Design a protein with these regions (language model features):
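Family-specific signature for flavin-dependent thymidylate synthase
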Residues: 1-160
């Protein structure tokens, strides 16, 4: 069972391995839970796609960015809640919700596909947000399959 921002889940679902069963905002009301970065995590992207690096921004811009994200999340949820309270269908009201909203899903995956996912998403070039989740998955899964993970580590983290 995984709970993460929608933008992280969309990266996760790009892996066409295993099966996913996601919480449905079409049939259930969405909780007021959104991702807001820490001020220290606000950075700028320098370079071309695929070959860029991140650099920190000044404290003022960092604070302003976090406030804008928080405000957007709050306004979006207010609009969503208003529509729900007026009887608008959940499947339509959800259209105003941002990708910073948290979602939940169940993920079923075999060991080989799990190791492929980890080798890609724990890599330093992976998006930091999904890398943190991949690290957590590793911490949960490796004690369950210690022999399998030991062989994977000895094979330079290359899935068989």
């Amino acid at each position: 069972h995984i709970k993460c921002p929608v933008f992280v889940a969309r990266e996760w679902f790009r892996h066409r391995i295993g099966s996913f069963n996601e919480f449905s905002a079409r049939y259930s009301e969405v909780p007021n839970e959104f991702f807001v970065p820490a001020e220290s995590d606000v950075r700028t992207q320098v370079g071309k796609p695929g070959a860029y690096r991140f650099e920190p921004v000044d404290a003022e811009l960092s604070r302003e960015t976090v406030e804008l994200i928080q405000k957007n999340n709050e306004q979006a949820y207010e609009a969503y809640s208003y529509m729900i309270s007026r009887g608008i269908a959940k499947e339509l009201a959800r259209a105003v919700l941002p990708v910073a909203m948290y979602t939940q899903f169940y993920w079923t995956v075999n060991a080989r596909s799990l190791m492929n996912f980890l080798s890609l998403r724990q890599h330093e070039s992976a998006q930091r947000d999904i890398r943190e989740y991949a690290n957590a998955v590793y911490e949960l899964a490796s004690p369950v399959m210690p022999v399998t993970f030991a062989a994977w580590e000895q094979n330079s983290r290359i899935a068989p």
